[in-house]
């Protein structure tokens, strides 16, 4: 399968939520999410295996490799850009990975409208856009709304992982995660990590001599 074999299942003017070819399409600038009847994840995957969800999946190298190595886990790859979704989809088919589903859409919208309570065991955020300029900070993923949704969709105990090359972003994310979750590491709550997995961004940043930072938090039992 080639990336261009995946076609958008609607015209922009007629956009709506759809599932096709193991891709859930969550359109932007759309206000009828509540009208879509989302099948259970057991139906979508065909089993009730535990679910891990990667956000910012990029070209899909990392998540496809993880899904192939852990067939006992169901994987969800969330990526906003359709050109990247095509690449994930192509790799998924060419690697004959059957335990991966793709979400083409915004992570916040997906969490809010399409994930129920306590359905995901692990959420992995790989190299999110740090939006370094002060006037752009409102676009950062790690904010109260996102963490509220994370706590809602995670099982108990559930894990939230962040990998980034941007230390300032890491420290800001840790500060807000500590308000909702418990760190699994001792202060300063992060470490450098080797052999985290093969992703396009990790390869890029390591080739430029950057350090890769990793942090992990767990959902507090009884938090709601």
Swiss-Prot record:
GO terms for molecular function: tRNA (guanine(46)-N7)-methyltransferase activity. Keywords: Methyltransferase, S-adenosyl-L-methionine, Transferase, tRNA processing. It catalyses: guanosine(46) in tRNA + S-adenosyl-L-methionine = N(7)-methylguanosine(46) in tRNA + S-adenosyl-L-homocysteine. One of its GO terms (cellular component) is tRNA methyltransferase complex. NCBIfam families: tRNA (guanosine(46)-N7)-methyltransferase TrmB. Catalyzes the formation of N(7)-methylguanine at position 46 (m7G46) in tRNA. This is tRNA (guanine-N(7)-)-methyltransferase. It comes from Chlamydia felis (strain Fe/C-56).
